[in-house]
């Protein structure tokens, strides 16, 4: 504390302890201080809907005309199914049509007057006549399960196929194994929304009911939705069973082949229709092995079964069982038989194979008596085949034998064909029979059946015209056919051929079939026509054989699927087409002979490996050295060309890794950097010894690749922490009190000099230097604490008393000198070298405290008596020097694998205290002069105090109450002198008296 007492100016404020004695001289002033943050059913076989037009005519009147109408088909899709399959594509199926239903146009008259009548019945030639038979198969969320090669994880084991040896003379054998026998899965094929509807239909004006007019272009439509369980396999079967009055097809008999297609025309199941049991048995193809969640809908053309549903205007129960689901509906059937008409005909059916028209004509249903009956048939676009002996004449013995359906039970009729001569003319396009045969009159009734074959030379639609020339009139009837969809024609019984051959494993990859090479089982083969429409599909048997049968002359396409784990061999090697491979897709031509040369060869796709080594590159040169070891547990990922992960592994204890079972192709190898390691330099030297980096693109082409390496070394990291704290505190306190009282008596000289000098120097230097160099993986810890305290204490007491009597000289000299030097030097030097894996931490604390306290009290009293000289000199000198130097130097070098810890503490305390008291008393008697000078000097270079003291003088001095002009000062001086003299005299007397 700066409590050093100093003497003030005579006009300043006197120290507190003296204020009470000065109240009368100074006025005391007071001051106030205010102190103030986010299904087609293809009834394939090319069945068509034919429109039959029959026309019976009298020459006087026409009572009824039914115009031919174009047959149309509609597709009905269950709305509920669509809702369940919003993600699937639904498309119209390819139309495999059947021209089975006929549109009948007939004109008849019930007039009995004998007139000449002309009957015209025409039939239009239909080639591959078809019905509008369509199927829509909707498959939702299907998963392809085909045996096409799929991307597999390289760690899996390829599925092996056992193939039995084939006969060495295979090329001389054209037979294939029996079709795969499956299981009936009626319980696994589920049908819903089954319906039998009349397409078009005719409304009976009397009853208001819709009727099925079988000879007037009407057909029936069987519709349903279906789903197939995923457990169904190729070869499994299910059935459609039609009831007593209901069958597939139209006026054209159903084809034996009935296929079920998907929306793209691919065959889901191949059906065989058995007319004896009126049942179609479907066998699933490999389609169901390729897809899951198969569901769809179909619409199939159907017809009344004429042999059972025989009577017009009668309701028959049309029933069908699809799988295990049964549905029935009553349908009113009408064939349009005119019982009063002497001549009427109808198409009994159209043969599905040769498209021949099987006709039935009723003659003299009314049982009229004639003397002339000539029956003539004229064909346009058709011909009779006299050698076929299919022109039959039956005599009716029972009127009921004229059944309305025009399909009489001929076993109950009397065959009288041999009694008549059938005369063919006009290139077998006209047949004439004289039904009287020498009789003069007759009322006999006949049923005549004929077969008309299409004539290729015809370019019109064709028709069949009948006339019955009697003695009364000439009757006529005409049957014509309109081809709704149109197709090619067949000439007689067209011969069918086979196409196919063999799929084999080409073990030597030469593209040719060798005697020791075996067939491949289970390869999918698809047959298409020249327009790309799928006709059939099959799967190779255990000997690699396949075959498509029942094919006409033409050009076909055969597609082979690539079996899993195989690669197609080279195609068309050499000149022998019988033993080479024709590739994945080939064209085969059938021209009046089987074509068994369509082969395809495959070899097992070779598998390759890649990999090698991950090592610790201790010298960081990017090359594998013999002394460098592998790194265990490094994760390695393999991606294919699409960026899909197909394998992961980890390096073994020797740093080795590999991926096996790879096909030729492009790959990427990704190394996952181990923790704590750094990627070494890449591609620095030959490919099998250098590091290839964290991600490596590689192409495998018919070879393994074991050059994919990578190297790492330990990471170079350095942690260096240097803290340097330097704290230097220096306190210097110097108080000097000087008090001088002087009483002077007459005629006395008193001289008192008091000098008080206090010097305090405090010097504190703290140097802290920390250098830290660190290299890879090095941690160094250096702590340096430097503390320097310097206290300097100096006490000096000086006491001088001087009494002087008259005529005496008193001389008192008091010198007090106190020097205190405090020097503190602290040097701290720490060097630390450490190698890798070390932390470097350098803390340097330097604290220097220097306290210097110097107190100097100087008290001088002087009494002077008359005629005496008193000289009192008091010098007080206090010097305090405090010097504190603290140097802290810390150097830390660290290199890999080294721990270094350096602590340096430096503590220096220096106390310096200097007190100086000086007291001088001098008494003089009368006749003396008293002069008192008091000098107080203070030197504190570190912290000057003079300015502070001056501020205090200014702030604390009491205001003067008197005038400050020289005159008043002089007056006061003289008054004081006189008072002093008086007091000296009085003091002198008392002193003498005391003596």
UniProtKB/Swiss-Prot annotation:
Q: Which residues form the propeptide?
A: 962-995
Where does the CNA-B domain lie?
Answer: 496-606, 607-717
Q: Where in the cell is it found?
A: Secreted, Cell wall
- Which positions bear Pentaglycyl murein peptidoglycan amidated threonine? 961
Instruction: List every stretch annotated Ligand binding A region.
Output: 51-495
| Membrane topology label | Peptidoglycan-anchor
Function comment: Cell surface-associated calcium-binding protein which plays an important role in adhesion and pathogenesis. Mediates interactions with components of the extracellular matrix such as host NRXN1 to promote bacterial adhesion.
Q: What is this protein called?
A: Serine-aspartate repeat-containing protein C
């Amino acid at each position: 504390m700066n409590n050093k007492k100093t003497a003030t100016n005579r006009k300043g404020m006197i120290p507190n302890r003296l204020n009470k004695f000065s109240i009368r001289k100074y006025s005391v002033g007071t001051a106030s201080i205010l102190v103030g943050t986010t299904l087609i059913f293809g009834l394939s076989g090319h069945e068509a809907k034919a429109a039959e037009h029959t026309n019976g005519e009298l020459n006087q009147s026409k009572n009824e005309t039914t115009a031919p109408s174009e047959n149309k088909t509609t597709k009905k899709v269950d709305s509920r199914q669509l809702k369940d399959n919003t993600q699937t594509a639904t498309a119209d199926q390819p139309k495999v049509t059947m021209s089975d239903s006929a549109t009948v146009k007939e004109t008849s008259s019930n007039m009995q007057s004998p007139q000449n009548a002309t009957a015209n019945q025409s039939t239009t030639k239909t080639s591959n006549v078809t019905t509008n038979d369509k199927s829509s198969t909707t498959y939702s969320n299907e998963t392809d399960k085909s045996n096409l090669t799929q991307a597999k994880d390289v760690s899996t084991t390829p599925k092996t196929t056992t193939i039995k040896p084939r006969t060495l003379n295979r090329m001389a054998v054209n037979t294939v194994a029996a079709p795969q026998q499956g299981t009936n899965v009626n319980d696994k094929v589920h049908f819903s929304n089954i319906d039998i509807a009349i397409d078009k239909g005719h409304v009976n004006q009397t009853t208001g009911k819709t009727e099925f007019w079988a000879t007037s272009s009407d057909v029936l439509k069987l519709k349903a939705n279906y789903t197939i369980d995923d457990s169904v396999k190729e070869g499994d079967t299910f059935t459609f069973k039609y009831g007593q009055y209901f069958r597939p097809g139209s006026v054209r008999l159903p084809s034996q082949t009935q296929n079920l297609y998907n929306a793209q025309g691919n065959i889901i199941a191949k059906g065989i229709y058995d007319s004896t049991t009126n049942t179609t048995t479907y066998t699933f193809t490999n389609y169901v092995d390729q897809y899951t969640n198969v569901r769809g809908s179909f619409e199939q053309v159907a017809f009344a079964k004429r042999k059972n549903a025989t009577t017009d205007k009668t309701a028959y129960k049309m029933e069908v069982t699809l799988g295990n689901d049964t549905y029935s509906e009553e349908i009113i059937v009408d064939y349009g038989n005119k019982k009063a008409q002497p001549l009427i005909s109808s198409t009994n059916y159209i043969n599905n194979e040769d498209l021949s028209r099987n006709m039935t004509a009723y003659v003299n249903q009314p049982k009229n008596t004639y003397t002339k009956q000539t029956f003539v048939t004229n064909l346009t676009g058709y011909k009779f085949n006299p050698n076929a002996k299919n022109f039959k004449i039956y005599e009716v013995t029972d009127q009921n034998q004229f059944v309305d359906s025009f399909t009489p039970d001929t076993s109950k009729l009397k065959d009288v064909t041999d009694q008549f001569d059938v005369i063919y003319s006009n290139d077998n396009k006209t047949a004439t029979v004289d039904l009287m045969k020498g009789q003069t009159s007759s009322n006999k009734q006949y049923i005549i059946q004929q077969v008309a074959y299409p004539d290729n030379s015809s370019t019109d639609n064709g028709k069949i015209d009948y006339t019955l020339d009697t003695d009364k009139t000439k009757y006529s009837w005409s049957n014509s056919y309109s081809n709704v969809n149109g197709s090619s024609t067949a000439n007689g019984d067209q011969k069918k051929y086979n196409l196919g051959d063999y799929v084999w494993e080409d073990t030597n990859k030469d593209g040719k079939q060798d005697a020791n090479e075996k067939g491949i089982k289970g390869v999918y083969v698809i047959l298409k026509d020249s327009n790309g429409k799928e006709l059939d599909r099959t799967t190779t048997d255990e000997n690699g054989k396949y075959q498509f049968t029942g094919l006409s002359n033409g050009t076909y396409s055969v597609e082979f699927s690539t079996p899993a784990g195989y690669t197609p061999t080279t195609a068309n090697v050499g000149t022998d087409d019988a033993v080479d491979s024709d590739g994945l897709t080939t064209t085969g031509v059938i021209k009046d002979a089987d074509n068994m040369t369509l082969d395809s060869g495959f070899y097992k796709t070779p598998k390759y490996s890649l990999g090698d080594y991950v090592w610790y590159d201790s010298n960081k040169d990017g090359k594998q050295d013999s002394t460098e070891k592998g790194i265990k547990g490094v994760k390695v990922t393999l991606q294919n060309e699409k960026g899909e992960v197909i394998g992961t592994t980890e390096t073994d204890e020797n740093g080795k890794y590999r991926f096996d079972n790879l096909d030729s192709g492009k790959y990427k190898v990704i190394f996952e950097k181990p923790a704590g390691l750094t990627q070494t330099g890449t591609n620095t030297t030959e490919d099998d010894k250098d590091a290839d980096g964290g991600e490596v693109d590689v192409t495998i082409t018919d070879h393994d690749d074991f050059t994919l390496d990578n190297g790492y070394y330990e990471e170079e990291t350095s942690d260096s922490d240097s803290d340097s704290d330097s704290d230097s505190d220096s306190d210097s306190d110097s108080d000097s009190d000087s008090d001088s009282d002087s009483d002077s008596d007459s005629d006395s000289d008193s001289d008192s000099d008091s000098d008080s000098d206090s010097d305090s120097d405090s010097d504190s230097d703290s140097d802290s230097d920390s250098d830290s160099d660190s290299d890879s993986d090095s941690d160094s810890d250096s702590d340096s604490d430097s503390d320097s305290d310097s206290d300097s204490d100096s006490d000096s007491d000086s006491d001088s008393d001087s009494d002087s009597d008259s005529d005496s000289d008193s001389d008192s000299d008091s010198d007090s000198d106190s020097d205190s030097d405090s020097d503190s030097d602290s040097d701290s030097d720490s060097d630390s070298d450490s190698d890798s894996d070390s932390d470097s931490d350098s803390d340097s604390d330097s604290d220097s405290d220097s306290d210097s306290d110097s107190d100097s009290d100087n008290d001088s009293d002087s009494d002077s008596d008359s005629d005496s000289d008193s000289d009192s000199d008091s010098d007080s000198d206090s010097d305090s020097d405090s010097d504190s130097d603290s140097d802290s130097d810390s150097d830390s070098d660290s290199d890999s694998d080294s721990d270094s810890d350096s602590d340096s503490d430096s503590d220096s305390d220096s106390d310096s205290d200097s007190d100086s008291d000086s007291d001088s008393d001098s008494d003089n008697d009368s006749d003396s002069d008293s002069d008192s000078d008091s000098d107080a000097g203070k030197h504190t270079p570190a912290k000057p105090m003079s300015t502070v003291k001056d501020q205090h003088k200014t702030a604390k001095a009491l205001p003067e109450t008197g005038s400050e002009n020289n005159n008043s000062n002089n007056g006061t001086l003289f008054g004081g002198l006189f008072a002093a003299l008086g007091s000296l005299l009085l003091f002198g007397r008392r002193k003498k008296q005391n003596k």
